[in-house]
């Protein structure tokens, strides 16, 4: 058989030479010796005579093979690179630390290591850039991940002593000081660039790297230089080069350019990051470890790609997610959405090139928010919260269709913020008068409307930009809620068509409907969000995902959490994309907790993600829910511990290891939770991200060093026992 593209094999046979009915099996052969190593463990496949005429072709596609070896199960660890800590790291995890993590994984019989996105997010040079999903390049890695120890010895001994003192100071901190770390490592890189840069850039290895990566490396270096030169990443505000022109940027980056020294510094840094991650990826392969990367669903609107390929993006909207367990107001990520119609014209080359680049380093990847390939939650640029969004693409409703459900359509009442005296008093109490004077104006009777100067959430946000006290935040959130208090949102392309506003049943305007109107609205709402789009979104996903998943041989895993349409598992099953299974976020809405023994084989099982509290953190969040879990899932009775002891965590971890999922990848914090002697005393400090807070500081760092972890015989032997006895090695 011939592999015509990653994971797709074909064979052509002359039907006149065959005897029917034909029985056959697939075999796995050694790539070198060509000897058969394994037969399918399955009934014979049968093919009856297709009775072809001369010149006719009969296709018989097979979607799955059944090798015993392919049914293995694997355990692994998920941790951001920035969270790693070694004795030699510089206040943040780096690509050199990855090899130590891989050593620990192999020592404990784990066979997978998963990390968060590692792309450059440098926008403001402040801690606000710590958010790893807001990258300025889909190719360039963040400079803070460079292992300075691999750059060679610094000749300036005085400077080296100063840097070493700073390294020890930053490495001793319990969390990452993002700004201090990046400033110090950048200064170190500048010194080493002056010392070795010319030699590195003249090497054959660098020239090969540059030739293969020039298409992104050159514009990235130019973007980074211009960002700092003009003091903003917003290229629309630059006095020059607001519109990307390849010939102008080539001249800017030419060796005879006055700024070439600074441009070349970015080349030097990206080259070292490339060879270090490539080394870590190859090391994982040698150790038999699946190295799993993460593909963010979005890019920064102030990014290299938005600058050089604006036609691929819709810059007038914001990507996000509807309300879910993470955020009652939805999530607004701020990313531009994709112009899929344009991407389709070149067979999604933008994505294919991106995945092929990832495949140089990784053997598996996670598609962040895979739902975005079916439809994306697009929020107007004037909104802060996600409640006024709409799915794109979608099938909006006409007025006639809305009324066909028995709901009389009243445009002003249903599409403009409903505000009355009762609402203002309930929401703002003794501050209602201030809100009336400042943000709303009287319309008629007891009805108010937003003042034009504050009729969007962005305008309100600007008013409160310098007001950080608790009372101001309460008023700001209340005014946001006034603006989103509508029943329907006009379609972005066809404003005479409408989408029911997400999660409006808990808002004041819904309470103004009578019981018949509420019933009619709920019927159209449920049909719209849970039935109407299934076939439509299935077709949308099948335009993109088959091409993208077959662009490389990497194992594809989808993050399918949130508001998941029925068509998502159809596509993921068909394309054999691994789902994500989390017990506290069950796929079956009738269950409070997922049944781990029912997880599909093609899935990734975990206890918590970076967007959630850890196992120990979750245990302490809701005591009544914890009691139900302790009694009904774990099968224990008696007094429920307020904090999760090690034995409870171990039992939960073991249950997850025993599940049918191909991959059981647990967060580093959840692995450590089973051992009360080494786990971090401060439960809350272990949390990586709080999605409801768009200004969260991503700074979690493991409290042990990797060297200490590798030497901890008792803990490591416990992991080996758990992994081996549950059939994951």
Region roles according to the model:
Residues 1-20, 27-52, 90:
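Aromatic-rich carbohydrate-binding modules that target alpha-glucans
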Residues 25-27, 114:
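Short, conserved beta-strand segments within well-ordered enzyme catalytic domains
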Residues 23-25, 208:
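Intrinsically disordered, low-complexity N-terminal regions enriched in serine/proline/glycine
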Residues 12-17, 44-729:
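Catalytic cores of glycan-processing enzymes that make or break glycosidic bonds
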């Amino acid at each position: 058989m011939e592999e015509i593209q990653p994971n797709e094999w074909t064979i052509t046979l002359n039907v006149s030479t065959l005897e029917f009915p034909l029985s056959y099996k697939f075999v796995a052969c050694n790539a070198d010796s060509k000897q058969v190593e394994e037969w399918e463990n399955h009934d014979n496949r049968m093919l009856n005579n297709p009775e072809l005429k001369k010149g006719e072709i009969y296709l018989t596609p097979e979607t799955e093979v059944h090798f015993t070896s392919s049914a293995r199960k694997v355990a692994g660890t998920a941790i951001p690179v920035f969270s790693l800590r070694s004795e030699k790291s510089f206040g943040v995890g780096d690509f050199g630390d990855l090899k130590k993590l891989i050593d620990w994984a192999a020592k404990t019989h784990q066979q997978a290591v998963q990390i968060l996105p590692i792309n450059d997010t440098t926008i403001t040079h402040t801690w606000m850039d710590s958010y790893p999903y807001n990258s300025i390049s889909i190719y360039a890695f963040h400079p803070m991940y460079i292992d300075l120890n691999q750059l060679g010895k610094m000749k300036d001994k005085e400077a080296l002593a100063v840097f070493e003192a700073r390294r020890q100071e930053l490495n001793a901190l319990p969390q990452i000081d993002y700004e201090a770390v990046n400033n110090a490592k950048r200064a170190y890189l500048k010194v080493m660039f002056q010392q070795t840069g010319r030699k590195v850039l003249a090497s054959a290895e660098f020239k090969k790297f540059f030739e293969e990566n020039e298409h992104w490396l050159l514009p990235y270096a130019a973007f980074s230089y211009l960002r700092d030169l003009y003091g903003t990443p917003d290229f629309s505000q630059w006095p020059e080069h607001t519109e990307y022109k390849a010939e102008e940027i080539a001249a800017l980056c030419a060796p005879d350019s006055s700024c070439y020294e600074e441009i070349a510094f970015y080349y030097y840094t990206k080259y070292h990051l490339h060879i270090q991650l490539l080394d870590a990826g190859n090391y994982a392969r040698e150790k038999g470890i699946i190295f799993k990367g993460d593909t963010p669903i979005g890019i920064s609107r102030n990014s290299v790609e938005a600058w050089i390929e604006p036609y691929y993006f819709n810059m007038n909207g914001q990507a996000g997610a509807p309300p879910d367990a993470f955020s009652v107001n939805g999530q607004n990520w701020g990313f531009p959405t994709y112009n899929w119609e344009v991407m389709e014209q070149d067979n999604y080359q933008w994505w294919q090139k991106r995945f092929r680049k990832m495949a140089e380093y990784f053997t598996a990847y996670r598609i962040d928010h895979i739902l975005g390939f079916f439809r994306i939650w697009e929020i107007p640029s004037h909104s802060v919260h996600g409640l006024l969004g709409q799915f794109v693409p979608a099938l909006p409703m006409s007025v006639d269709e809305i009324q066909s459900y028995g709901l009389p359509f009243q445009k002003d009442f249903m599409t403009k913020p409903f505000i009355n005296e009762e609402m203002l008093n309930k929401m703002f109490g003794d501050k209602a008068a201030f809100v009336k004077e400042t943000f709303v104006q009287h319309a008629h009777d007891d009805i108010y409307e937003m003042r034009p100067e504050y009729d969007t959430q962005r305008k309100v946000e600007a008013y409160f930009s310098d007001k950080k006290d608790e009372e101001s935040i309460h008023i700001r959130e209340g005014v946001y809620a006034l603006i989103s208090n509508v029943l329907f949102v006009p379609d972005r392309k066809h404003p005479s068509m409408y989408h029911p506003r997400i999660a409006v049943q808990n808002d004041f305007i819904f309470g103004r409907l009578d019981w018949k109107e509420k019933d009619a609205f709920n019927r159209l709402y449920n049909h719209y969000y849970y039935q109407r789009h299934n076939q439509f979104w299935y077709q949308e996903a099948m335009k993109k995902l088959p091409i993208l998943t077959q662009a490389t041989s990497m194992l594809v895993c989808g993050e399918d959490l949130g508001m998941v349409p029925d068509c998502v598992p159809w596509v993921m099953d068909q394309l054999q994309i691994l789902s994500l299974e989390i017990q506290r976020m069950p796929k079956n809405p009738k269950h409070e907790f997922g049944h781990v023994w029912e997880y599909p084989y093609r899935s990734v099982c975990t206890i918590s993600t970076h967007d959630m509290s850890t196992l120990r953190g979750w245990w302490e969040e809701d005591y009544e829910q914890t009691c139900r879990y302790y009694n009904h899932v774990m099968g224990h009775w008696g007094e429920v511990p307020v904090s999760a002891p090690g034995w409870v965590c171990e039992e939960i971890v073991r249950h997850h290891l025993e599940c049918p999922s191909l991959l059981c990848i647990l967060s580093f914090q959840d692995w450590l939770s089973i051992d009360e002697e080494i786990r971090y005393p401060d439960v809350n400090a272990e949390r990586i991200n709080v999605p409801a807070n768009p200004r969260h500081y991503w700074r979690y760092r493991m409290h042990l060093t990797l060297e200490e972890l590798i030497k901890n015989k008792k803990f490591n032997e416990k992991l080996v026992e758990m992994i081996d006895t549950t059939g994951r090695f």
